[in-house]
């Protein structure tokens, strides 16, 4: 049988690390001490190894003293001082509280077989003392009754002196408890306890005597513990170390001592953490926290029940509470859902000091310095003051934001499509330029130019030019940052996750070697960059110059404005127009349209010239690229940062839409010839000029693609589609596939934004189902063009569905005669679509629409056709009984006649409450079957989207068992099967109001027809209307003026044609006499005709005036020649031909008389024509509605 050895605790404690820790020197993490006695105490790290057991010896005596101070706190005799000293290896601890009772201990005397007194038992008998069985509300730091005995068992000698007010007890213990001298007991009125000891240093790994460094380290550590105790006992008890009082009598003083070196002058946040129930409420905790970016991990000092504990649930509770506050504040501040912060992040910059007493805790760990208590004690009973958490959280979040900014500075991404210049980052880095190409086609052009080699030896090459792709688009960095002002007043710019992860912009940062924490004010800073400049190489269109280049400029202005100031940001200004003249090899190049226009006006004719536009870099042919790169430096222009640029960058790219809206209410002021000459002369472009011209033009163009013009209710894309349709289907209105027609529009109307979006616009322009945007589509759809089921999203592929022009409607709503009078968009020098139409009726208020753009929201609800017809007719017809009333209303900007929302194709109800109309769906209830059948939905609510919205509503689905959709493309039949006994509960929970009943409320069968009447103006910019009447009133003068222009132009053309036809008839009559066939040439014949008074005429202009204005007709029609006579064929000189011409003249004269009459009619020229056209439009609409917009 194996033998079991039995040893007493004394011998075991000598040899083992039980309770005290290692008995030899080891590296102790976080060991600190106070080495200075200056006015400002400072805790410093101790880097040398030390013995944990030795420190435990000293610590046990100190904790015993603070336990005694706490125990006497409520007694008559309090502890007023604790004196700790350490000199030449001798440690001493004394307090003036009631001494240890000096009485014989009967049990110990029987065991020792001699007289043993209580002080000896307390200091020499293991597992003996008052800490063996502690009460639940005990706040002593001592445990197990072994602390003082550990000190004795590891000491060469120790002297215990105590006085209880009657007697004084002195006893010496030698040789590690092996020799216990008899005590000396004498009368005394004193009260105190003092223990002096000399540890067995040699056995614990120290020199004997202590070396100078060992003495210094141990003294510093003991001094630190004395300072901790001073904070723990607080006022009323003075802690002395080597006879000098410790000046750390508060938690704030202790926190300052710890952080004075690492974070001097930092704000110390303090608080008292109180509990709400006994025994915890009797002992509030004092906490001090220092927040500083210099701290890299969470650190704490906890003096709980006098013990310097290394961890515990109280710390966990504090960290979790801080973390919750930090996360909440962080998300509120940064407003970036992708940015997350963790417990480690939120607490990594905090140093916390916690001092106080916690009842009922247990001490765990080898050295009994780990606090253990149920965590729910803190959650349930303790609360941290909100003011403390708030102030500290602000400081933490400020540091987190700063750290994010610095951390993101080193974000690495894979840089795609980058070719490094050979000298980039080297000694000649400042001579290198980074060419930032808009996309792949631009990269191809640059590569061609940079690899010309021997054919262009002095030109740019990869030696000093690098290339990078901008990917065709750039993120707006201005909207991806948060500017946060810290408590110290510093502004921190925090980039969100999207921006820091953006491969294009981050790639530019890496390639250039940019640093977000550097301003680049000095040449020394700029010399660290890998390139001397960045050159934007973008297309000469609105997307390239206005958008992409503007965003690149905004990016540099946001983070490195000094680089723009010092000419670092440039652009490659390529020719926009080249004019090739016959017989000449070198073209005339223009960089701005204004330059070309000014040049063209000076030319007598451009017949022998070929004009080519180059809006895209890919349009330049290889031989043109070679020519460009021979003069490359002359095409590189530098941006300058002028005074107004900062505000304009904020307006166009910042987050304040109201500022941008005010700026975009007006159109672009084009560059003057003087401005373009100035730009070329110095090759410098002010940023403000670029923003006010190119960027503004892009923004306005984007608006016109998203928000309709109030004159025709159309966006630019829809207008291109209509113009393309009129042209495409003019001769043959046979159906065409959507994708084929889209190609025609892109080609003839110069649509540059992709076939997918164009095809989608064509499909929408042909959709005709309940709830579709267009009540009056301009196209007839053949095939599946979508339904209300998915809101039109279920349309077929553009390859399979076809369209025709809704010609009967188009011809009446947009009279062909108007097309010659409208202003047109010119793309690449060619006429495209009108800038706007002016339809016979105000289409802008006849259809539905919704879209946001640049801070504006556009929402319209179609108005009732009958009301619109009544209003327009009343305006036009002077005999209309409401004519005078309407004109009075217009003049005084009031509303009289109704202009209600349209209810066409809608089986629900429209009701008005206050200033808004509401649309209501309909339903039937079968109480027996417990089913509600929805038979109509509110206006413009798609079926599937509606059902999904109900299913997502948890409080509604509580009452619903099943939803079944039996709806067709024309009708609504949605069965809502209720759970048993739900109907009464629904009526009870979803209260009936004046505006809706319970079922309408429950099933969301009502929507508000709230409008945002923001439209594009004829000359660009946005106009904000307050009512549909205002739109109508604004539209009326444009349509009215068009009739006068139409009649006046027709009048001018008729007069010219009558002049020409009359001259021809006269010539026929006199042709035999004139006998022009006998003359040698046309010049001689023309002289004869002139001498006989025949007018020279511009025959082509008179026959086909097309887009010529009245002024142009009057100027050029009579400045022609005699071709109209000299080109007459023999059969045209016959009497029958002459007779036909005379009849034609009579008809033209009759029409001229009619036109003159129309010009004089009341209330304005052409009023009767307008009324006729209104009738024709109404007739076409009725036919379209009766035929499901098929017109057959």
From Swiss-Prot:
Positions annotated to bind Mg(2+) 2: 539, 541
Family to which the UniProt record says this protein belongs: Belongs to the type II topoisomerase family.
Gene Ontology terms, MF aspect: ATP binding; DNA binding; DNA topoisomerase type II (double strand cut, ATP-hydrolyzing) activity; metal ion binding
Main location: host cell
GO terms under cellular component: host cell cytoplasm
UniProt-listed GO biological process terms: DNA topological change; sister chromatid segregation
Co-factor note (free text): Binds two Mg(2+) per subunit. The magnesium ions form salt bridges with both the protein and the DNA. Can also accept other divalent metal cations, such as Mn(2+) or Ca(2+).
Protein name: DNA topoisomerase 2
EC numbers for this chain: 5.6.2.2
Catalyzed reactions: ATP-dependent breakage, passage and rejoining of double-stranded DNA
Residues bound to ATP: 64, 95, 142-149
UniProt-listed Pfam families: DNA_topoisoIV (PF00521), TOPRIM_C (PF16898)
Annotated site (Transition state stabilizer): 799
Task of the protein: Type II topoisomerase. Processively relaxes supercoiled DNA. Displays DNA-supercoiling activity only when associated with the viral histone-like protein.
Position of the signal peptide: none
EC category name: isomerase
């Amino acid at each position: 049988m194996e033998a079991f050895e039995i040893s007493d605790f004394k011998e075991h404690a000598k040899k083992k690390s039980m309770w005290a820790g290692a008995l030899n020197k080891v590296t102790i993490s976080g060991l600190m001490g106070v080495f200075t006695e200056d006015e400002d105490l400072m805790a410093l790290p101790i880097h040398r190894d030390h013995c944990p057991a030795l420190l435990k010896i000293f610590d046990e005596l100190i904790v015993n003293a603070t336990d005694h101070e706490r125990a006497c706190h409520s007694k008559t005799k309090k502890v007023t001082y604790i004196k700790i000293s350490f000199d030449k290896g001798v440690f001493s601890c004394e307090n003036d509280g009631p001494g240890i009772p000096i009485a014989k201990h009967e049990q110990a005397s029987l065991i020792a077989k001699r007289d043993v007194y209580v002080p000896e038992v307390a200091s020499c008998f293991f597992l003996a003392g008052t800490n063996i069985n502690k009460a639940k509300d005990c706040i002593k730091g001592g445990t197990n009754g072994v602390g003082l005995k550990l000190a004795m068992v590891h000491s060469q000698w120790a002297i215990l002196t105590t006085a209880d007010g009657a007697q004084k007890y002195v006893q010496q213990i030698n040789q590690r408890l092996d020799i216990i001298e008899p005590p000396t007991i004498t009368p005394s009125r004193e009260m105190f306890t003092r223990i002096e000891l000399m540890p067995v240093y040699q056995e614990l790994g120290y020199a004997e005597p202590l070396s100078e460094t060992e003495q210094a380290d141990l003294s510093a550590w003991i001094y630190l513990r004395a300072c901790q105790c001073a904070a723990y006992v607080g006022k009323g008890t003075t802690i002395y170390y080597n006879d000098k009082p410790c000046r750390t009598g508060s938690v704030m003083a202790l926190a300052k001592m710890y952080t004075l070196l690492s974070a001097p002058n930092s704000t110390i946040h303090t608080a008292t953490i109180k509990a709400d129930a006994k025994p915890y409420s009797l002992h509030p905790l004092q906490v001090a926290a220092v927040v500083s970016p210099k701290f890299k991990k969470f650190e704490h000092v906890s003096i709980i029940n006098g013990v310097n504990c290394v961890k515990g649930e109280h710390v966990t509770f504090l960290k979790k509470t801080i973390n919750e506050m930090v996360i909440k504040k962080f998300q509120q501040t940064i407003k970036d859902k992708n940015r997350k912060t963790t417990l480690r992040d939120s607490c990594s910059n905090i140093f916390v000091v916690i001092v106080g007493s916690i009842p009922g805790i247990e001490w765990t760990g080898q050295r009994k310095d780990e606090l253990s208590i149920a965590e729910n004690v803190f959650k349930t009973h303790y609360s941290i003051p909100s003011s403390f958490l708030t102030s500290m959280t602000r400081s933490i979040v400020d540091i987190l934001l700063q750290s994010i900014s610095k951390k993101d500075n080193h974000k690495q991404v894979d840089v795609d499509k980058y070719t490094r210049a050979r000298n980039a980052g080297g000694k000649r880095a400042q001579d290198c330029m980074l060419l930032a190409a808009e996309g792949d086609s631009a990269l191809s052009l640059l590569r061609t130019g940079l690899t010309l080699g021997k054919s262009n030896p002095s030109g740019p090459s990869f030696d000093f030019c690098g290339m990078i792709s901008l990917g065709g688009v750039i993120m707006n960095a201005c909207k991806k940052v948060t500017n946060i002002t810290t408590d110290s007043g510093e502004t921190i710019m925090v980039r969100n996750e999207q921006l820091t992860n953006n491969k294009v912009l981050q790639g530019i940062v890496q390639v250039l070697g940019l640093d977000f924490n550097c301003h680049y004010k000095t040449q020394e800073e700029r010399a660290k960059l890998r390139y001397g400049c960045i050159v934007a190489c973008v297309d000469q269109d609105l997307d390239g110059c206005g958008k992409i280049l503007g965003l690149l400029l905004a990016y540099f202005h946001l983070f490195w404005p000094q680089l723009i100031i010092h000419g670092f940001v440039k652009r490659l200004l390529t020719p926009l127009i080249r004019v090739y003249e016959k017989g000449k090899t070198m073209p005339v190049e223009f960089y701005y349209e204004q330059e070309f226009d000014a040049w063209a006006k000076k030319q007598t004719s451009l017949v022998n010239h070929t004009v080519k536009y180059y809006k895209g870099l890919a349009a330049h042919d290889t031989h043109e690229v070679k020519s460009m790169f021979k003069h490359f430096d002359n095409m590189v222009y530098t941006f300058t940062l002028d005074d107004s640029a900062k505000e304009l960058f904020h307006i166009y790219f910042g987050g304040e839409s109201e500022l941008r809206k005010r700026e975009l209410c007006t159109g672009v002021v084009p560059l003057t010839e003087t401005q373009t000459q100035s730009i070329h002369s110095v090759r410098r472009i002010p940023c403000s000029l670029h923003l006010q011209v190119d960027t503004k033009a892009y923004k306005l163009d984007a608006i016109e693609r998203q928000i309709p013009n109030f004159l025709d209710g159309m966006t630019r894309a829809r207008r291109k589609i209509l113009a393309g349709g009129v042209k495409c289907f003019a001769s043959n209105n046979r159906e065409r596939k959507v994708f084929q027609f889209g190609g025609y529009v892109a080609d003839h109307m110069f649509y540059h934004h992709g076939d997918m979006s164009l095809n989608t616009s064509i499909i929408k322009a042909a959709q005709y189902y309940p709830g579709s945007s267009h009540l009056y589509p301009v196209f007839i759809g053949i095939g599946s063009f979508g339904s209300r089921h998915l809101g039109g999203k279920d349309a077929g592929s553009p390859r399979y569905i076809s369209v025709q022009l809704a010609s009967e409607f188009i011809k009446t709503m947009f009279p062909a005669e108007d097309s010659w009078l409208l202003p047109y968009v010119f793309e690449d020098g060619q006429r495209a679509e009108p800038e706007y139409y002016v339809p016979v009726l105000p289409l802008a208020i006849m259809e539905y629409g919704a879209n946001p753009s640049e801070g504006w929201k556009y929402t319209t609800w179609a108005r009732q056709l009958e009301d619109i017809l009544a209003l327009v007719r009343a305006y036009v017809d002077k005999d209309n009984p409401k004519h005078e009333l309407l004109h009075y209303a217009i003049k005084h900007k009031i509303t009289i006649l109704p202009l209600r929302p349209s209810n066409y194709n809608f089986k629900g109800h429209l009701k008005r409450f206050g200033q808004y109309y509401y649309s209501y769906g309909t339903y039937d209830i079968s109480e027996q079957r417990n089913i509600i059948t929805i038979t109509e939905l509110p206006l413009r609510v798609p079926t599937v989207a509606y059902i999904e919205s109900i299913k997502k509503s948890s409080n509604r689905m509580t009452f619903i068992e099943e939803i079944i959709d039996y709806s067709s493309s024309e009708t609504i039949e949605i069965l809502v099967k209720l759970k048993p006994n739900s109907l009464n509960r629904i009526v009870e929970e979803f209260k009936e109001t004046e505006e809706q009943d319970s079922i309408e409320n429950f099933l969301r069968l009502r929507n508000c027809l709230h409008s945002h009447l923001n439209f594009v103006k004829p000359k660009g910019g946005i106009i904000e209307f307050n009512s549909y009447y205002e739109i109508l009133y604004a539209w009326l003068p444009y349509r009215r003026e068009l009739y006068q222009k139409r009649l006046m132009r027709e009048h001018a053309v008729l007069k010219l044609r009558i002049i020409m036809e009359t001259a021809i008839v006269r010539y026929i009559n006199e042709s035999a006499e004139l006998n022009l066939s006998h003359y040698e040439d046309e010049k001689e014949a023309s002289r004869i005709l002139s001498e006989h008074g025949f007018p020279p005429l511009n025959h082509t202009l008179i026959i086909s005036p097309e887009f010529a204005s009245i002024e142009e007709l009057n100027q050029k029609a009579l400045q022609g020649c005699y071709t109209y006579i000299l080109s007459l064929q023999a059969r045209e000189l016959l009497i029958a031909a002459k007779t036909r011409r005379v009849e034609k003249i009579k008809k033209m004269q009759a029409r001229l008389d009619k036109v003159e009459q129309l010009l004089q009619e009341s209330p304005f020229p052409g009023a009767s024509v307008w009324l006729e056209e209104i009738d024709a439009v109404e007739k076409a609409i009725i036919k379209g509605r009766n035929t499901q917009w098929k017109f057959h």
